[in-house]
């Protein structure tokens, strides 16, 4: 089996461009752009003057708007001036009416003073009556509150006594059950602890003390045994060293 031919034909781009020949003209060239027709300086001046003047229609519109605006300003001024005059007239009328009312009030004040004195005495009597009623209501409310607080305290004390009784009964039941269980264990013959279990919660502390003492004695015995073993090992090492030294001397 032969190898596959992976060669590619190389084409020189410059030679290909020469073979195509000169490129066709597409669109205007640079020379055409440079040789374009241009306006003279006089024509440019005329165009600038026209721009400064602006259009006639716009100028007419601005004139009309200015005229309308001036008319509206005049109307507004007239309204404001008329309103100021009318307001001044109204103020004068109000002043005159106040003067008349003050004169009438001065004449009526003398008559009203006597009426006010009688009304003041009546109002004082009413205030005293209302004060007495309020005191009575407060006294009643205080009595009710004291009676309600006493009843609440009694109910709380009853509840507390009931709770204490229920707790005591529950503890007694627990003690009875524990005593019954210990009796059963003693009947079965669990050993020397049966007599101690029958003696109740008072001897539990003694049992704990005995256990602590026994544990301490066991620890002491173990410590003594360890010390003896260490002493024996040390004495054996000394004997070996002494025997080795004697053999060397011989």
From Swiss-Prot:
Residues 39-49, 59-80, 155-176, 214-224 have a biased composition (Basic and acidic residues). Residues 103-121 have a biased composition (Low complexity). Belongs to the FAM133 family. Residues 90-102, 130-143, 177-186, 225-242 have a biased composition (Basic residues). InterPro entries: Fam133 (IPR026766). Residues 18-250 are annotated as: Disordered. This is Protein FAM133. PANTHER family: FAMILY WITH SEQUENCE SIMILARITY 133 MEMBER B-RELATED, PROTEIN FAM133. It comes from the Eukaryota.
């Amino acid at each position: 089996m032969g190898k596959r031919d992976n060669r590619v034909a190389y084409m020189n781009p410059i030679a290909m461009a020469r073979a195509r020949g000169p490129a066709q003209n597409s669109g205007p060239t640079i020379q055409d752009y440079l040789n374009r027709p241009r306006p003279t300086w006089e024509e440019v001046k005329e165009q600038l003057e026209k721009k400064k003047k602006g259009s006639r229609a716009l100028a007419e519109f601005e004139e009309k708007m200015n005229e309308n605006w001036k008319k509206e300003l005049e109307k507004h001024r007239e309204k404001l001036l008329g309103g100021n005059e009318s307001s001044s007239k109204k103020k004068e009328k109000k002043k005159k009416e106040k003067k008349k009312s003050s004169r009438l009030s001065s004449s009526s004040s003398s008559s009203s003073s006597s009426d006010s004195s009688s009304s003041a005495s009546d109002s004082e009597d009413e205030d005293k009556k209302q004060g007495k009623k309020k005191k009575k209501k407060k006294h009643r409310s205080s009595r009710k509150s004291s009676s309600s607080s006493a009843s609440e305290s009694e109910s709380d004390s009853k509840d507390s006594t009931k709770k204490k009784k229920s707790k005591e009964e529950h503890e007694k039941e627990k003690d009875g059950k524990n005593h019954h269980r210990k009796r059963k264990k003693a009947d079965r013959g669990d050993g020397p602890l049966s007599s101690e279990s029958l003696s109740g919660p008072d001897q539990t502390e003694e049992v704990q003390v005995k256990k602590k003492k026994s544990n301490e004695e066991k620890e002491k015995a173990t410590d003594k045994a360890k010390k003896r073993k260490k002493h024996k090992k040390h004495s054996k090492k000394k004997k070996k060293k002494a025997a080795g030294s004697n053999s060397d001397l011989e």
